[in-house]
From Swiss-Prot:
A motif (Cx9C motif 2) lies at residues 37-47. It comes from Xenopus tropicalis (Western clawed frog). Residues 13-55 form the CHCH domain. The gene is chchd7. Belongs to the CHCHD7 family. PROSITE patterns: CHCH. This is Coiled-coil-helix-coiled-coil-helix domain-containing protein 7. A motif (Cx9C motif 1) lies at residues 16-26. Its main location: mitochondrion.
Amino acid sequence: MMSRNRRMRDLDSNPCLEETDASTKCMDDNRYEKDLCTPYFVKYKNCRKFWNGIMVTRRREGTVPYMPTAEERKHILESMKSLPY
């Protein structure tokens, strides 16, 4: 079993890794002034909300794993033509 920190850095476990890194970098670059990083936080929050909805739907349908793998997520996003968040 992976530790929580390692799981959060794993692309298969964390669908919003890119958004996580962007918001962290913004905070580092702006000396932790949250107001300057609000757009990054909103994008991260919307990303989590979107993939949580996908996960709930898959769980309801009995699809395993509940969270799509990184490869599956790539295909889902490509089929949408633009990022939903």
